[in-house]
Design a protein with these regions (language model features):
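A short, structural micro-pattern
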Residues: 12, 61, 112-116
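Residue-level signal for secondary-structure boundary sites
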Residues: 26-28, 75, 128-130
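Beta-strand elements of well-folded, non-transmembrane domains
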Residues: 20-24, 71, 120-128
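Internal, well-folded beta-alpha domain core
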Residues: 82-84, 91-221
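Residue-level detector of short, conserved catalytic/binding motifs and their immediate flanks
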Residues: 16, 65, 118
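Glycine/small-residue-rich interface belts in oligomeric ring/scaffold proteins
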Residues: 9, 32, 37-81
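N-terminal, Lys/Arg- and Ser/Thr-rich interaction peptides
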Residues: 5-34, 208
Length: 221
C-alpha cells in the first residue's frame, strides 16, 4: 500500500487497515429529504459501523482516519420500501410500542452506489477505564479480519447492502478529486438528544481524510 502519511495514534502507532467491498451501498446525504441520495464515498459513521461489526468492546472506540476509494464510482436508482412510523429510542429499548410498518409504508427513490470497494484506516482508542493497551485491540482486530470473524454482518450504509471484508491489498485508490460538502463526523449518544459533529469533506486522489475532531452543529444525521 502507498504510505498516505496519515495521523498516528496517541501512542504513535499507524492505523489498522481493513478492505471492504460489496455489490451496492447507500451512504445517505442528510440534506436531501424526499429522496435518498448517496455520497459518492463511504462516510466515517458507516465505516465505524463496519469496524464495530468486526470487533468492538465497550473499553474502546473507533477513530476513522481515512477512507480510500478503490473502485470506480457508479450509481443506480432503486425504489425502496420504508416506514414513516418510527419508535423512539426509549420505546425501542422497552419494547412497549409496536411499529406498524404495513400501515405506514412508503416508497422512496434512492440513488445508490454499485460495485464498491474501500480501504478503511482507523485507530482503536482505549477509554480511561480500559485495562488493555491500544496494541491489544489492534492485534485482536487484525486477527479477526484475517480469519473473517465478525460479531454481526457488516453492511454498507443500509442493512440490505451487505459488506465483505478482508486484509488490505496493494490496489491503488481511484484518481478522483471532488468536494463532497458537509459530512457527518460522529454522534455522541451520551447527550439527550444525541449531538452531532460535522466536517467539510473532500476526496483527493481517491482518499477521504477525516479530521480528528468534527465541528459541533445541530441537524439530522
Amino acid at each position: 500500500m502507498v504510505n498516505l502519511g496519515l495521523r498516528r495514534s496517541a501512542s504513535g502507532a499507524s492505523p489498522v487497515v481493513v478492505q471492504v467491498w460489496g455489490e451496492a451501498a447507500l451512504f445517505t446525504r442528510p440534506e436531501l429529504k424526499v429522496e435518498r441520495v448517496s455520497y459518492p464515498v463511504m462516510t466515517p459513521s458507516a465505516a465505524v459501523g463496519v469496524l464495530e461489526s468486526i470487533y468492538w468492546k465497550p473499553q474502546f472506540r473507533w477513530d476513522v482516519v481515512a477512507i480510500e476509494v478503490l473502485a470506480e464510482i457508479k450509481q443506480f436508482t432503486q425504489r425502496r420500501n420504508e416506514t414513516t412510523d418510527l419508535a423512539s429510542l426509549a420505546e425501542a429499548v422497552s419494547g412497549r410500542r409496536r411499529v406498524d410498518t404495513v400501515a405506514n409504508r412508503v416508497q422512496r427513490n434512492a440513488v445508490c452506489l454499485r460495485d464498491v470497494a474501500y480501504r478503511i484506516h482507523a485507530h482503536a482508542v482505549p477509554d480511561k477505564n480500559s485495562d488493555k493497551p491500544e496494541a491489544a485491540y489492534r492485534d485482536q482486530f487484525r486477527r479477526r479480519v484475517t480469519r473473517g470473524s465478525c460479531f454481526s454482518q457488516p453492511y454498507l450504509g443500509v442493512r440490505e447492502f451487505s459488506a465483505f471484508f478482508g486484509d488490505p491489498d496493494d490496489r491503488p485508490a481511484q484518481p478522483i478529486t471532488e468536494k463532497l460538502g458537509l459530512m457527518l463526523h460522529s454522534v455522541d449518544h451520551s447527550t439527550t438528544p444525541p449531538s452531532f459533529t460535522w466536517f467539510d469533506a473532500e476526496l483527493v486522489n481517491g482518499v477521504l481524510r477525516v479530521p480528528e475532531q468534527g465541528i459541533p452543529a445541530t441537524g439530522a444525521a
